[in-house]
């Protein structure tokens, strides 16, 4: 890499050298030499040396079974260590200017206050921001939690290395710690022996909060307060919470039979338990800190003029938190303890009121400096996390709710709900929603699947509203899908109005989303229920799998525009929930860019976004990194609200309509209409083998017997990223752009790319995907794994990809992909010589296991390690 990345290169070199020493100690010198030889051959092969490529393939094919696992592990761990070094580089004091952008919030405040936006308007926007980041597990984080903790410790060592004041002895101790950690990593199994349970996934999410976000939230808000005070002279309120966190881990039952009402209850208890435990740590520290005697009259009266009034209040809180933890421990162990609710932290105010009193007393007694330390941090954590830590969303497929009502109407002799038309369904549902008598008879014994849905809504009814987020209905298409859930909640005795959120996923459903919501607003009962606000979820993964990325992106944009219009006309506040994945094929990409490319008026200070699997670690895994990510989200939502992008010109819309139409035709011509496509996909990728990898808790398919359409978006993307063709992230888009160029529209496309954030984002995402893709490697998989009679399809796909790259370079008037983002390009180029050998070995091992039907345990484990290694190198799974 170039000199501007010298510190990154140095860290990668140090970690690589220690890993090499570890391998030499565990294996031997000849084995390490072989790894180095293959690495050098991979580099030469990248530069077009065919002899080096042949030598590398010969060496890989000759690896004995006992060397397969350590070989795959060596390259896998190098890539993980390179990721750590790169992640650390973005927060390092030696970070170069191309990588470390200035603080986005500070920049935005400067731009806004230089005459463009009124100060009061800016402050009002900041204080009413409602950004909800929803942690999900299903793409799935491929690294084990035990390894992630070790990776964090490696980062601590890298940070220590930057301290210029270290003595020689301290440097040696730090280097020894680094060697110990890398040895621990080497000797730890990277592949789980069993799939994680939904509870395991929820615990992983909680560990991210404990390890990083718990510290990052007060750090970020302190930084934000300083920036605002510096520019406006005003302080932010102590309870400001521009960003909060929700979760799907333990609440998302769509296609996951392992998420039951019992599991959801356990996760809710674990969330509360973690919050209570972390607040207890804060209170223990505050007992030590707040030893002062001076207080305001309110606090002195409450504590009988105690000499240590702050400690009196804090000791009582400390005991309540300990009792709460004991109570939740008993519940998690399966007991039903009887308790006096007054002795527990049961509501947010049980913590907020006493802490606010202490804060007020300190500030009124001239001790603001003390008040604005740990006490303010705790108040801000409370405003962000509450006493439940994460608000748990519930998600279920629309058909599962319909099945409940259908089974019930058949039992009651009313006919079959599933066979009624939409008008009949709505009439029945509204009649029951408006009525007072219960619909479900006491003596009814429903089927197991229906009983599980009923158990879930009853669980919701028993919870505090602040423990839960939204009820998301996947594959929603009609108003009756929403009304059905509302009726089930009513029947369960739910006293609080829960947000019921339709998720529009397919191309057709996205196109009909606005008319569905408009029909709901036309119902008086529903208008009364929603109380002036509506949340709608936009699905990115399934729409892209259904129609390709270009057509899906335009459908998502158009759906949002229409939803904004419908809600504005009805005078209802719209919150859009973006179900993005980590990868481009699932709507992923830089969050800041993505938010600023939304239609004008669609953000308006409110947004929900899923943060998925491995992206949670990349964005929030370290406190300083998390502060950066929180600042990016805050600045993007403020900018999209106060300085929205321009409305697209009519000719841009027309061009996008043509691009969407051409791209979906090209995409479906392959994925749906090409008779050999499924056979090619199964042969050319490790899709079948991925099903054996113990990743997330959720099955890879919605239906066991289904084809591509039943395959979840995540394994669909994961499989294509393994053989480096990256097909879902570009298929259809390049062909549509080429057709536009052939029509003489290149000048128009350039104008769109330069002036329209939505289109510029689409093109830059395409560039990134093309840069990560490796058609020559995909061809090697084909040679090893695909029957000769299907090779024509691979040739056609690679030809389409070449066309796409050519037209994107013409459009951007660039000589090379990602020339305007050198950091990203360097990052890809750094990894390639380490990913390539894993890809070549993976193809070899796939061929072996498929030929022999039952491979040795060494071969199977090595194959799993290559899958994990390629995922680490590509920095995405699904």
UniProtKB/Swiss-Prot annotation:
Active site per database record: 138, 545
Cofactors that this protein relies on: Mg(2+)
PROSITE patterns attached to this UniProt entry: PEPCASE_1, PEPCASE_2
Keyword Magnesium: yes
The enzyme's E.C. designation: 4.1.1.31
Catalytic activity entry: oxaloacetate + phosphate = phosphoenolpyruvate + hydrogencarbonate
Cellular component, GO annotation: cytosol
Domain of life: Bacteria
Family annotation (InterPro entries): PEP_COase (IPR021135), PEP_COase_bac/pln-type (IPR022805), PEP_COase_Lys_AS (IPR018129), PEPCASE_His_AS (IPR033129), Pyrv/PenolPyrv_kinase-like_dom (IPR015813)
Pfam families: PEPcase (PF00311)
Keyword vocabulary terms for this entry: Carbon dioxide fixation, Lyase, Magnesium
EC class: lyase
Single Gene Ontology BP annotation: tricarboxylic acid cycle
A GO molecular-function descriptor: magnesium ion binding
Its biological purpose: Forms oxaloacetate, a four-carbon dicarboxylic acid source for the tricarboxylic acid cycle.
Family to which this protein belongs: Belongs to the PEPCase type 1 family.
PANTHER family membership: PHOSPHOENOLPYRUVATE CARBOXYLASE
Name of the featured protein: Phosphoenolpyruvate carboxylase
Source organism (scientific name): Shewanella loihica (strain ATCC BAA-1088 / PV-4)
Taxonomic lineage from the root: Bacteria, Pseudomonadati, Pseudomonadota, Gammaproteobacteria, Alteromonadales
